[in-house]
A protein has these predicted regions:
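Short hydrophobic signal-anchor/transmembrane segments that target glycosyltransferases
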Residues: 293-300, 456-470
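Glycosyltransferase donor-sugar binding loop
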Residues: 307-313, 473-486
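Short alpha-helix at the nucleotide-sugar/activated-sugar donor binding site of glycosyltransferases
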Residues: 538-539, 562
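Donor-sugar nucleotide-binding helix/loop cap in glycosyltransferases
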Residues: 523, 537
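Short hydrophobic beta-strand element within catalytic cores of glycosyltransferases
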Residues: 543-552
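Alpha-helical solenoid repeat scaffolds of the TPR/TPR-like class and their adjacent stem/linker regions
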Residues: 1-439, 450, 489-496, 508-519, ...
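Short acidic/histidine- and often glycine-rich active-site loop of Leloir-type glycosyltransferases
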Residues: 554-565, 570
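Short Ser/Thr-rich beta->loop micro-motif in glycosyltransferases that lines
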Residues: 355, 524-530, 548
Length: 645
């Protein structure tokens, strides 16, 4: 905090006393109280540079980010040379996710003020947040030439390497940042490092970081406010209690955000207004799954708003999503506050989060409570831990009532399966094994999950299957070049001849589905199952064998199998999983019966019946809104039979 000389006039002394009170509160970490004191000082002396800067800092620390921006702008107007005010303004713009504005502002800074470490650090973040990763790395290198032991810059440079698919370089940057000391950011970086190491199939290093994650989470109080990388916890851990705590710790960061003002709406006979918020309304798995739901929403009963804060990739999928929406609202670059205010202005009855704690999420919007009922759905396979999310939309398999204690939200169970599917997805076309690089006479075990989902325990089972089935080959997806050599090393250590491994390149959806049908059995991963990949395999007519754990992410494939009438392929232990694969491998007739059933399922099974699914979802949305309109608090809404179409 700034130090000022004690003033002489009575009015100035009163302002100074308030400032001193604010400084004392800030030293205790009581930023909300500090802000009140600094604002009291400003009411007495509204043009004081020091009071403005201190108010901006306290507002930023207490999550009053819009106020922080206002105070920093006022401080700069009074003193354009204030370095502190400049970087407080940048920090506020970044927190508001106004990334393009942040970058433009930093590039407008005069050359003689661009020499410091703080400037290059801020510029690196702005470049990173606008997708300019190579330039961001160069900016962070400028920081490190000035201070090589800047832990945050090593970490942030790792993020840019990660986005460039250079996972091993990212890991080294994360590790360096941790060694140098990242303070309250350490847990988040342990999560990022564990995830990056799993993506590279460097399992010894990943296991070390996963243990660090668990140890830190276990040692924190439930009310701590830390960044936790929830997606890493949800996908790498099979412990639902641990996942809930990690998500709760993350949600605590939003505790002091004030709700936006909502205008009450007496709906009466008017349609229910449903809003979906996402950054993924383009060629993305979420849109691939949701497109037909948007097209089939009953416009006589629902007024649907799609709020997009992600990129427009000009794809056919983007055009399809826009055409399906009654209201498509473009909000890319808008702050959380601005998005929340727009949603509140639209008087949305039910707002649905399609991101959870994934990249480009806007949980800060939901923390502002722009809608009276808020739910999370599809994008994040686990609990948000957030008190401002009322419901998690699942089904009796992924969110069974017996697991309710593992979720902060109330359960909203669809009748069959939570995952929507698009009947307009490409149907498999004829393709030969030779064209896909597969032997005609082999039993092909297909493991097309991303590399991070392959755990050592699962690979042990797969290698055992190759030993037990001499004519089998293992068909894996070559997601990125850095994972393959490490996975091949793990296979070799387990005694597998690498000639029995086939690598599949990444393809477009139509070709991918066509080649998937060439396999004999899809073998799933644990503790994070195949999700869209599993429904693609079932659509292609391929039997899927899975192992269901105790978490949402480990039960998804089981839910999909239930929805196509193949629950017997969902096992409850790795031993049973292995035995099921062996039984199918030895029984070509059984595999053919399953294939025939799946071909029929494309047109008849609930998993692929988009009309039925949409009515089921709408019935659930109606139950949520009706409960609120009756003055009742959110409660578990368990599955009921899907409405007839």
């Amino acid at each position: 905090m700034n130090v000022i000389t004690k003033p002489a006039s009575r009015q100035a002394r009163q302002a100074h006393q308030q400032w001193e009170r604010g400084v004392a509160q800030s030293r205790k970490g009581q930023w909300g109280e500090a802000l009140k004191a600094f604002e009291a000082a400003l009411r007495i002396s509204p043009k004081d540079d020091v009071y403005l800067v201190n108010a901006a800092k306290a507002a930023l620390e207490s999550n009053r980010v819009e106020q922080a921006l206002e105070y920093s702008v006022r401080a700069l107007a009074r003193n354009p040379d204030s370095e502190v005010a400049l970087f407080l303004r940048v920090a506020a713009l970044q927190r508001l996710q106004n990334h393009e504005e942040t970058l433009a502002y930093l590039r407008s800074v005069p050359e003689d003020r661009r020499q410091g470490r703080e400037y290059w650090s801020a510029l690196g973040c702005a470049l990173q947040n606008t997708g300019k990763q190579q330039e961001a790395i160069a900016a962070f290198m400028e920081v490190l030439t000035r201070q090589m032991d800047d832990a945050i810059s090593h970490y942030r440079m790792g993020i840019s390497f990660y986005e460039l698919q250079l996972k091993e370089e990212a890991s080294e940057c994360f590790r360096t940042g941790l060694v140098l000391g990242l303070g309250p950011n350490a847990l988040h970086v342990h999560g990022m490092l564990a995830y990056a190491e799993r993506e590279s199939c460097r399992w010894v290093q990943a296991a070390e970081e996963e243990a660090n994650m668990r140890s830190i989470v276990d040692g924190l109080s439930d009310t701590a406010r830390v960044m936790t990388a929830p997606f890493a916890h949800v996908t790498l851990s099979g412990d639902p209690v641990h996942q809930l705590k990690a998500s709760r710790l993350m949600s605590n960061n939003f505790a002091e955000i004030k709700p936006v003002v909502r205008r009450p709406r007496a709906r009466g006979a008017q349609r229910i207004r449903v809003g979906y918020l996402s950054a993924d309304f383009h060629q993305h798995a979420t849109s691939v799954l949701m497109a037909e739901v948007f097209e089939r929403h009953d416009q006589a009963q629902f007024e649907v708003f799609l709020y997009s804060h992600g990129p427009d990739d000009k794809s056919a999928m983007r055009q399809r999503i826009e055409a399906a929406a009654e209201h498509f609202v473009e909000l890319a670059g808008a702050s959380d506050q601005a998005i929340a205010e727009r949603i509140a202005h639209d008087q949305i009855d039910l707002l649905i989060d399609l991101k959870g704690y994934t990249a480009q999420n806007r949980m800060g919007v939901f923390a502002r409570r722009p809608a009276p009922v808020q739910a999370t759905f599809l994008g994040f396979p686990g609990t948000t831990g957030a008190p401002f999310i009322d419901y998690i939309i699942g089904d009796p398999v992924v969110t069974p009532h017996g697991h309710a204690a593992h979720f902060s939200e109330k359960l909203a169970q669809l009748s069959v399966c939570y995952q929507p599917n698009d009947r307009q997805r490409p149907r498999p076309q004829a393709m030969t094994r030779q064209a896909a690089g597969l032997p005609d006479d082999a039993l092909v075990l297909c493991g097309f999950n991303q590399a991070y989902k392959i755990s050592p325990e699962v690979l042990d089972v797969w290698c055992g299957l190759l030993e037990d089935i001499p004519h089998a080959v293992l068909w894996l997806l070559d997601w990125h070049g850095q994972a393959r050599p490490h996975l091949e090393e793990e296979l070799s250590v387990r005694g597998v001849d690498l000639a029995r491994i086939r690598w599949a390149p990444r393809l477009g959806l139509a070709d991918h589905i066509s080649r998937t049908q060439l396999a004999d059995i899809f073998i799933d991963t644990w503790p994070c199952n195949a999700h869209t990949t599993a429904s693609d395999a079932l659509w292609a007519g391929l039997p899927v064998v899975t192992f269901m754990g105790q978490t949402f992410a480990s039960r998804v494939a089981g839910s999909l199998l239930h929805a196509v009438g193949l629950s017997e392929l969902a096992t409850s232990s790795l031993k049973a999983y292995r035995e099921k694969v062996l039984a199918l491998a030895a029984d070509p007739a059984a595999r053919q019966r399953i294939r025939d059933q799946l071909v029929t399922a494309r047109d008849q099974a609930p998993l692929f019946d988009s009309a039925r699914y949409t009515r089921d979802l709408e019935a659930m949305l109606t139950r949520m809104v009706s409960r609120h309109e009756q003055g009742l608090s959110p409660d578990h809404l368990l599955a009921s039979p899907a409405p007839a179409v």
